[in-house]
A protein has these predicted regions:
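ER/Golgi luminal nucleotide-sugar-dependent glycosyltransferases, focusing on the catalytic module
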Residues: 1-241
């Protein structure tokens, strides 16, 4: 199996960031994805008005050994970087780009603190929906990349209110590092912020696998304000559980 690499972008914003991040981190642990990975990169931005203020110490404490002989030491495969300014997803996407260039055979998962600045039941449903397919079902994602797909996820949308831009709406995805190397990296630093989300689809010849599409983020739904930012989408809508 290829090496598995996880890149996470976190924004420590508002009063719910620890709750969200802890849930996301625990999911990595309980699904076995953490154990299967060879590298986990955390790119973090702190908002000055966050509550509580001790986010830096908290995330480092979370990823320390528990009962091992090396108690108190950050796991060697975990790298935590705090960015000096908020450039949204850009700095973590740059890390992915640079890592992929040096490690073209690896498989990369990207996810982030989706919805932390617009925290509602609807955005939480959206986040959990994406996490179900890319984290809980991570072995299925690996299988699809092994089969020859370049990237996979949910909500692969092309026709948007902003024009034709293939992308995974919400920006949670798995991708081959070799495929990352074929993307238009100018999208990352574009002044138009949506290019960051559209970066993953900037190769028109991509072989995509989409596990599921709620259709809530289709063009007409977004125009009607009936997308995932507004509409609740509980787990029973996409699983048999």
């Amino acid at each position: 199996m290829k090496k598995i690499v996880i890149a996470y972008h976190g924004y420590m914003f508002g009063s719910r960031y620890m709750e969200m991040m802890a849930a996301q981190f625990r999911l990595l642990l309980t699904t076995g994805l953490y154990q299967a990975s060879s590298k986990i990169y955390f790119g973090i931005v702190e908002d000055e008005n966050r509550k509580p203020l001790n986010g830096n110490a908290w995330i480092h404490d979370f990823w320390k050994f528990g009962s091992s002989k090396e108690k108190g030491q950050i796991l060697s495969k975990v790298e935590i970087v705090f960015y000096p300014e908020n450039r949204e997803l850009r700095d973590t996407l740059h890390w992915i780009k640079d890592y992929a260039r040096e490690n073209p055979d690896d498989y990369i998962l990207f996810f982030h603190s989706k919805g932390i600045t617009h925290y509602t039941e609807s955005t939480e449903d959206w986040r959990r929906y994406m996490e179900y397919f890319v984290i809980e079902k991570w072995k299925d994602c690996i299988a699809k990349l092994d089969e020859g797909h370049d990237c996979c996820g949910v909500l692969w949308n092309k026709d948007t209110p902003l024009g034709y831009f293939p992308h995974f709406s919400g920006a949670f995805f798995w991708a081959k590092a070799g495929y990352i190397n074929t993307l238009n990296h100018d999208y990352i630093d574009s002044a138009w912020r949506y290019h960051m989300e559209f970066w993953i689809g900037s190769n028109p010849n991509a072989k995509i696998f989409e596990f599921h599409n709620s259709r809530l983020n289709d063009k007409d739904s977004l125009i009607a304000n009936k997308g995932h930012y507004s509409i609740q989408y509980p787990r029973n809508m996409y699983t048999n559980e």
